[in-house]
Regions:
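Glycine-rich FAD pyrophosphate-binding loop
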Residues: 42-65
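Active-site/ligand-binding neighborhood in enzyme catalytic cores
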Residues: 20, 134-262, 270, 284
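Mid-domain catalytic core of redox enzymes
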Residues: 20-21, 44, 255-402, 406, ...
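N-terminal Rossmann-like FAD-binding beta1-loop-alpha1 element of flavoenzymes
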Residues: 20-50
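C-terminal lid/capping helical subdomain adjacent to the catalytic/cofactor pocket in oxidative enzymes
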Residues: 6, 414-417, 425-518
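A short, basic/flexible loop-to-alpha-helix module at the beginning of a structural domain
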Residues: 2-22
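A short alpha-helix-loop-beta-strand transition element characteristic
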Residues: 63, 85-110, 164-168, 318-319, ...
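Dinucleotide-binding Rossmann-like beta1-alpha1 core, especially the glycine-rich loop
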Residues: 67-145
Length: 518
């Protein structure tokens, strides 16, 4: 099977040259994957129609604006080892729209702040010599007696850090994120998100830097990057500009429009029915590129998919997400992009300082702190009123010691459903059942992106699946399901900067251009 590194560029099948191929490609979803695919198609002169059910572009990579404040939902560092993605970013936005930002994250645990990734000196100082020795011995012990079951997230992390560090720095946070024990989750999530990380890596990397031995970016573990690019008005400006370019290139982008049916006839998708403001339209198509949740895609197929496929779709699960954004004086901010909250006595999982991402997201003299809560749609937190959520966020921010309650000037709530696909013990089989059905019965339906493939991809990996999918439509045979799975791809892909990558400054001292009104 061909991989992203070994494309088969055989010409398209003869059937693709008939009138059917003159129909547009319908792209479902206006997030990074969908808009990247649409841009690639439009640039090649192919007809394309994007349908996005929301009124805001970018999916989870959007920038939300309220009263002139801008929020990056989930936080999106623009760092990649994938050259075409890097080049695409700079094709969409000019150099002056990027800032170069310092990467800084910490863990709040036991009333103390720990550097993340874990640094030896800081951890020793906070844990104390005796507990640090215990953690070291615990790590050595798992080298001799590794966990019997490393197929779970718990087993995967313990095998890399030891039991004591797992309990200190991973257990509580992961249970907040997923709402279940890490022993009930697949190791796949850890393999994607912390691949290449271990206690040894965390100790050796700072020593390497202190000795002046900087790693080439092509071998750098992504979790250890020291700086990253960032659009000055947040990630949403990338996707708003991308959609504008799609339209300029002859494509069509429809907002507040929902795909309600994907019609399959004769072994392929032939049309997509969309709905907007009470009316519907059937759009004939040559291909469907879908970044809608894989569960939703299976449910809109007409005629319906078999019971086995429907059951697999129903058994895929998601974790939802909400941000409580609190406006506070600038001096109440912190230098981190975010702080992971491992304290079990508060429900917040992570706190962003939007001013540390970009001064253009906040207003002079004040900053905005994003309290991030991991929830299930319909649970107590999700259904809580905005006023009560702002009160909860204020209370927990004060409990942690970052602000006094009276410092909070205003608060806003943003809810994001289906933010994280859950890697439980059945997800892989369920995805394979759905994937196999589409490959056999509607091969011109192409799932892409995080929710489209039910894969916890980063933004760049989601974009790359879209790029490879467009190449497949044009005649190649890439295996897009290997993206962010193969070790070689994830760890050693070339990472030169690409054209136009010169940035306009670093850190909080990046040049501040006149802010737009509001």
């Amino acid at each position: 099977m061909a991989t992203p590194h070994d494309p088969d560029t055989a010409p398209a099948a003869a059937g693709e040259t008939d009138a059917f191929s003159d129909r547009p490609v319908v792209v479902v979803g206006g997030g990074p994957a969908g808009l990247t695919a649409a841009h690639r198609l439009a640039r090649a002169g192919d007809p394309v129609v994007v349908v996005e059910q929301d009124t805001v572009l970018g999916g989870i990579s959007r920038t939300v604006e309220r009263d002139g404040w801008r929020f990056d939902i989930g936080g999106h560092r623009f760092f990649t080892k994938v050259v075409p993605v890097e080049e695409f970013w700079h094709e969409i936005l000019p150099p002056e729209d990027f800032l170069l930002r310092p990467r800084m994250s910490r863990i709040f645990y036991g009333g103390k702040y720990y550097d993340y990734p874990i640094k030896l000196g800081n951890a020793l100082g906070n844990l104390g010599v005796l507990e640090a020795i215990r953690c070291g011995l615990s790590f050595l012990w798992v080298r001799v007696r590794p966990p019997k079951d490393q197929s779970t997230l718990e087993g995967y992390i313990v095998s890399n850090y030891g039991w004591r560090l797992y309990r200190h720095f991973f257990k509580t946070y992961n249970e907040k994120v997923w709402g279940v024990s890490a022993s009930e989750l697949s190791a796949d999530w850890g393999a994607q998100r912390i691949k290449g990380m271990s206690l040894w890596t965390a100790v050796w990397e700072p020593l390497r830097s202190s000795l002046g031995r900087r790693r080439d970016r092509r071998s750098q573990v992504t979790s250890l990057i020291e700086e990253f690019q960032y659009p000055k008005y947040g990630p949403g400006m990338m996707w708003e500009r991308c959609a504008e370019q799609v339209a300029d290139l002859g494509g069509e982008v429809r907002m507040a429009t929902t795909a309600t049916r994907v019609h399959v006839e004769g072994g392929k998708a032939v049309a997509v029915t969309v709905a907007r403001e009470g009316s519907s339209e059937r759009i004939a198509c040559s291909h469907v590129i879908s970044s809608m949740p894989l569960t939703a895609l299976a449910r809109v197929v007409d005629p319906p998919v078999p019971v086995e496929v429907s059951a697999a779709a129903d058994d895929l699960h998601y974790r939802d997400f909400l941000t409580v954004a609190l406006v506070v004086p600038a001096e109440r901010g912190f230098p981190d992009n975010w702080i992971y909250i491992h304290a079990p006595d508060v429900e917040v999982g992570r706190i962003q300082n939007f001013g540390s991402w970009s001064p253009y997201l906040v207003k002079d003299g004040r900053t905005c702190l994003g309290m991030e809560y991991f929830v299930f749609e319909g649970d107590e937190l999700w259904t809580m009123s905005d006023e009560d959520l702002v009160a909860l966020g204020t209370k927990e921010l004060a409990h942690i010691g970052l602000v006094d309650p009276g410092d909070v000037e205003a608060g806003y709530v943003v809810r994001m459903p289906k933010a994280y696909p859950v890697y439980d013990d059945t997800y892989r089989d369920n995805v394979e059942i759905i994937r196999r059905w589409f490959e056999e019965h509607a091969p011109n339906v192409h799932p892409v992106g995080r929710n489209g493939m039910h894969k916890y991809n980063n933004q760049d990996h989601s974009m790359y699946t879209a790029m490879l999918t467009v190449e497949n439509i044009q005649g190649a045979h890439h295996d897009i399901w290997s993206v962010n799975v193969e070790e070689e791809y994830h760890e050693t892909s070339d990472a030169r900067t690409g054209p136009g990558a010169t940035t306009s400054g670093t850190g909080r001292d990046a040049p501040v251009l006149p802010r737009r009104a509001g």
